[in-house]
Amino acid sequence: MPERLPEFYTAVYRLVSRVPKGKVVTYGQVAALLGVPRAPRGVGTALRNLPRPLSKKVPWQRVINASGGISFRGDVIRVEEQRWLLEDEGIEFSRHGKVDLKKYRWVGPKRWKTPKWKTQL
């Protein structure tokens, strides 16, 4: 793992770390808040590459897909872990495995400073 994280990853981690307990945000929502609305997959990549030491500080489990589901990453154990962590925070799932985004979606910070890397594009 490189010593320095890509600036986009750092911006994702900073934003996701602000999602309160008991709330969720979508990959697309994170991308839009960062000023790159077409980059939800980049958000997923950043979270998939979250360094182990940061996983205690960045609540990665609070990021779900636009339909309210947990995105399968080829690792059933991680999917189960994410659901368990969310349920532990009081988030309920439908019988179809979906989170009610109307109830649990975090709308984002009241003020969000555009990341430095974005202003340099």
Protein language model annotation of sequence segments:
Residues 1-121:
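Nucleic acid-binding interface residues in structured DNA/RNA-binding domains
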